[in-house]
């Protein structure tokens, strides 16, 4: 078994060329040539340096472990966005458009981890998938905020080519992924609040 990490554009081409059997991606990125098996839903979060003045404007959200910060307040800020090859970029652009955010500067990064690290260093603000947030830790504090999971949350799926019959190992891998995802997404929504991280 080979596990490969990459951007959406590369992984989609590799699946189409039969270089990959399965891909994990957002439901919104599934094409008509793919079948998809749902794994779970993750929030799409704002990330700010721990000492950023906008942190004072956050408000608690009932039922969420993340406070809400109005993205409109990001106007004038340096904002880290993913490259256009990353599926997250479409969500980031939708948020900026929906909230009429006028960034002071836009800095493009090749992955969320780098963007989050630059935010931790106080060089700007950005966005991050909740699944990344759960696994990334920095010596400098950052704050995470929900925006609106019903509009920007991402259904995560495992997909495969529609014209491929699943082999026994592929079915077994999908079942293992579903089991792991159930446990993982349960932890995302039941672990302690990062409000005071």
Question: How would you describe each model-predicted region?
Answer:
Residues 49-53, 162-164:
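Short loop segments at secondary-structure junctions
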Residues 12, 16, 36, 71, ...:
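Short hydrophobic/charged patches on amphipathic alpha-helices used for structural packing
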Residues 31-38, 42, 66, 113-163:
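Beta-alpha-beta core module
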Residues 8, 89-93, 111-112:
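Conserved glycosyltransferase catalytic-site signature
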Residues 189-196:
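Conserved small/polar residues in nucleotide/adenosyl-binding loops
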Residues 16-24, 44, 119-125:
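Alpha-to-beta junction loops
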Residues 56, 62-99, 166-174, 183-185:
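Secondary-structure junction motif
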Residues 1-32, 108-109:
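Central regulatory/effector-binding core of bacterial HTH transcription factors
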